[in-house]
Amino acid sequence: MVMKASVDDDDSGWELSMPEKMEKSNTNWVDITQDFEEACRELKLGELLHDKLFGLFEAMSAIEMMDPKMDAGMIGNQVNRKVLNFEQAIKDGTIKIKDLTLPELIGIMDTCFCCLITWLEGHSLAQTVFTCLYIHNPDFIEDPAMKAFALGILKICDIAREKVNKAAVFEEEDFQSMTYGFKMANSVTDLRVTGMLKDVEDDMQRRVKSTRSRQGEERDPEVELEHQQCLAVFSRVKFTRVLLTVLIAFTKKETSAVAEAQKLMVQAADLLSAIHNSLHHGIQAQNDTTKGDHPIMMGFEPLVNQRLLPPTFPRYAKIIKREEMVNYFARLIDRIKTVCEVVNLTNLHCILDFFCEFSEQSPCVLSRSLLQTTFLVDNKKVFGTHLMQDMVKDALRSFVSPPVLSPKCYLYNNHQAKDCIDSFVTHCVRPFCSLIQIHGHNRARQRDKLGHILEEFATLQDEAEKVDAALHTMLLKQEPQRQHLACLGTWVLYHNLRIMIQYLLSGFELELYSMHEYYYIYWYLSEFLYAWLMSTLSRADGSQMAEERIMEEQQKGRSSKKTKKKKKVRPLSREITMSQAYQNMCAGMFKTMVAFDMDGKVRKPKFELDSEQVRYEHRFAPFNSVMTPPPVHYLQFKEMSDLNKYSPPPQSPELYVAASKHFQQAKMILENIPNPDHEVNRILKVAKPNFVVMKLLAGGHKKESKVPPEFDFSAHKYFPVVKLV
């Protein structure tokens, strides 16, 4: 290690090595290696020397600069070969534009698929798809199969880009939409490209049939190989055509197009095994002489677009492997099949649940965008047929049965009441469309946006309460036996609470909370949010029953026949049951964490620049914009959760027993649910072992150990299995 003591000359000769520089230069260099190593010996293992001039900013800069990914922009200077574009490569004879062999076609197609997927995963077109020279200008290609495939890939990219841009549920880390001035085959129609692909497909199918083995005939190995290779090209070309046709179907406004896409996805899935089994037939990439692992093979040049990249450090594009490509397409097909199912839903609440469940799989940006554009066609109508206002009214009817939406009620035909409810419903459209759009974003961005949308729902809550009061006053004059109190307000409050719960729970999924914070997060959920949610659901259920009774009495008055009463399943009963289970899980975790803290098993940081209060207030800051339910401030929380108010205050064994009862209660509730879904089974996988662990801890197991427990979130994203170490 050397250090420059003074600068006497300029930095000419910067390409020389350090010893050569030292010899040539007039500068006085001092070797500090020995001194540096001796100074390092004084530091203990893991200890760092803090210098005033070397703070966190400089440390991060050093880490970033030394990361090999930061050398991506420098690769061009370290290549031993000449980088050629498509036209230069044709003149140079390094690329074939006609008479491509079957292995060449297979290899190029597979690598193109890999580049396409890498682009969909957030890298730029310049570093992925457009490293394939054939894609730059398909007009130069004379080979019909290669030309049709290149145009097909361009069209897939163009429609995918249009869909993702239209849905607007991507961030810079999800998707790069820049085309860098490349033509996206706009001069050729979609129909023409699918026709060209079909022609190649038919031609390949004829070759597949002509090389097929016949009964009793001895098989020529060369003919068999040709048969396998023709089948491989046929499968890839057909897959490209089907994928393109699916994306075209999603651009149509008719709902029938979704059914068409569903059928095509089945065809695409059937082709994947043939593609997977023939991966070895394609030409393989040669060893790259550059740093990085971009494939170098005929038709590909990873550095061809290096000059198009922005002056900032380019992202390091690691092209996925061919084996992974098939698995990715299989998952993409499954996701698109799921997207197609949304058109079968009619209730807004079911649609919201569908979006939540779909988002939990962390789907790719393309499938998220397709779901958004299928739901709201041109941002006007749901599935292109239903008005969002009608969906909101149906959701209100099914959830809380407000008298104003009942045809048998006086308010239904009252102009003033009609104006009130119509105005409220119109104001609901934007927040609910925004909420559905939020579920299209990636999981990390969703949480941030949920925090912001609470403000809109708080305003809606205020309006709902005012409309309820106005409608109630009108109703009392005509039908004193009926009430219109807290109908619309209950419905908006329900959605408010769901957003708040989702906001807090997603923090566990994203690993945002430290272990010492768990106890107040679970407390807020169990004692506050789930308690409010259950009372809101019970109130909605009560409103439904009251409305049903009035309807039955009106029916009785008209009909003298006695009708047999069937036991009706309450629409909200399952949700109330699930909320009870969630509340018990949260309460069990809260008491577990408090007991661990008492036993000294929770490591707490030495707060220097902040405190627990600062952290608490930061975690619940978005809730300050909500008036109902009112936010619980830190001092209020400390007072409400203070165990000293009990006489005598419970000790850790009693808390472990209480926690075990909560886990047992959750287990019993869930085991009684008919037709349990995946979510029920996932929670049971946590409730059962936690019940056993709490029993062990209550009996004094590992009482003296101060080793913190492990929290395993693999079974469920929000509730960990507690493991004693």
UniProtKB/Swiss-Prot annotation:
GO terms for cellular component: cytoplasm; cytosol; NatC complex; nucleoplasm; plasma membrane. GO terms for biological process: negative regulation of apoptotic process; smooth muscle cell proliferation. The modification Phosphoserine is found at S187. Residues 548-573 are annotated as: Disordered. Residues 558-571 have a biased composition (Basic residues). It is found in: Cytoplasm. Keywords: Cytoplasm, Phosphoprotein. Coiled coil: none annotated. Component of the N-terminal acetyltransferase C (NatC) complex, which is composed of NAA35, NAA38 and NAA30. Auxillary component of the N-terminal acetyltransferase C (NatC) complex which catalyzes acetylation of N-terminal methionine residues. N-terminal acetylation protects proteins from ubiquitination and degradation by the N-end rule pathway. Involved in regulation of apoptosis and proliferation of smooth muscle cells. Belongs to the MAK10 family. This is N-alpha-acetyltransferase 35, NatC auxiliary subunit. It comes from Homo sapiens (Human).
